[in-house]
Amino acid sequence: MTNVLKVAESDVADPSLAGEGQRLIDWAAREMPVLRIIRERFARERPLEGLRLGACLHVTSETANLAITLKAGGAHVSLCASNPLSTQDPVAAALARQHGIPTYAVKGEDSASYYSHIQAVLDTHPQLTMDDGADLVAELHKGRRELLDEVIAGTEETTTGVIRLRAMAHDGALKFPIIAVNEALTKHLFDNRYGTGQSTIDGLIRATNVLLAGKTFVVCGYGWCGRGLASRANGLGAHVIVTEVDPTRALEAVMDGYRVMPLAEAAPSADIVITVTGDINVIDRSSIERFKDGAIIANSGHFNDEINLAAIDDLSVEVTAPRTFVQSHRLRDGRTIHVLAEGRLLNLAAAEGHPAAVMDMSFANQALCAEHIAKHHKDMALAVHDVPQEIDREVARLKLQAMGVSIDTLTEEQQKYLASWESGTT
């Protein structure tokens, strides 16, 4: 286990950081008005009363506001980290000490500690799971099957997790319903695009202090995360190249003004390469062998599988750490390749993750989906479900309201026209 101090039922790095953590939580709350509105209603109505909720999420100030909202709704919340490097230790301390939320998370924890913390959450016998990458659900199905009958349903935050869970459902392995929060329009159009775009650039600059203007910047993957990252890199003056395996997305990248080519072709000229795919070994040995001396590579997709770290290690004769989140690998042929954040999520390891304003919508979806599960779980089929449209639209409405933005509404005449098939060319 990582050497940590313990507070009550929690496992955090330093309980004395709770005051600092509370200040971070309060600062994030300023930018999360939708979640605040939901929390105030939850405190009155208690829709989650008595529900044991096990969450495996990035332990950040934004996540803390979600956990506090769920507790206000009556849930017994237990929280562990969904990435060994993403935890904000002051926030973990504040949740444990000042909010009484059992929290198991230490920034930089080793693999054994990471999985022991997941087990600690499972030890609470959760009735509802809330995941970011599906590690909690996977561990529950693989090693704690005696608990499955107690789980009524769960939610999943990320693209990677949704892919895993749909694979489980396809194989008949999934034993309770899941709502794919990632599929909400108010999640992936904003969190994935604007959140990942900004926070990845933030992590890159904090880790390296590199100037982006004039650099050749390769974005691997052109989903919503890739779109956001390419846009932000382009805005800072980088020459952006996109690599893709999907012809439609590749075509979209071309139409958006980027050069598109295979990674093997882009690698020799790349100054910076960042993966945002959710797949394994996107940067593989063949690419590593083509990178020029001094290339910087990083991952902002999920887990630490997108870069073939074993191949880099095999090609390396020396590894140094010139900066906190930089590992410089000197290869046998004399080139040096710089790997950021151990190949883990750059935006959460080297920076602070997505801005609170976009997480406001993502976590509003999480909270409202938890309420939906509490009310309707008996009617949910054993499958991976989309977020109910009424929840998605309500989150958008509340966000616009909080921003002071008004929109038009359809007139009765317009509604009647849209519902009719009889009117045509006149």
Regions found by a protein language model. Give the residues of each.
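Adenosine-phosphate binding glycine-rich loop
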Residues: 2-8, 17-33, 48-52, 56, ...
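A short helix->loop->beta-strand "cap" motif at the edges of active sites that frequently abuts
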Residues: 74-75, 101, 147, 174-176, ...
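Rossmann-fold NAD(P) dinucleotide-binding segment
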Residues: 37-40, 71, 123-125, 137-138, ...
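Ligand-binding pocket scaffold of soluble enzyme catalytic domains
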Residues: 12-14, 23, 36, 51, ...
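Glycine-rich phosphate/diphosphate-binding loop of Rossmann-like nucleotide-binding domains
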Residues: 57-75, 187, 191, 195-270, ...
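Glycine/serine-rich phosphate-binding loop and adjoining beta1-alpha1 elements at the start
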Residues: 2-48, 81-215
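ADP-ribose/adenylate-binding Rossmann-like module
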Residues: 81, 129-133, 144-160, 279, ...
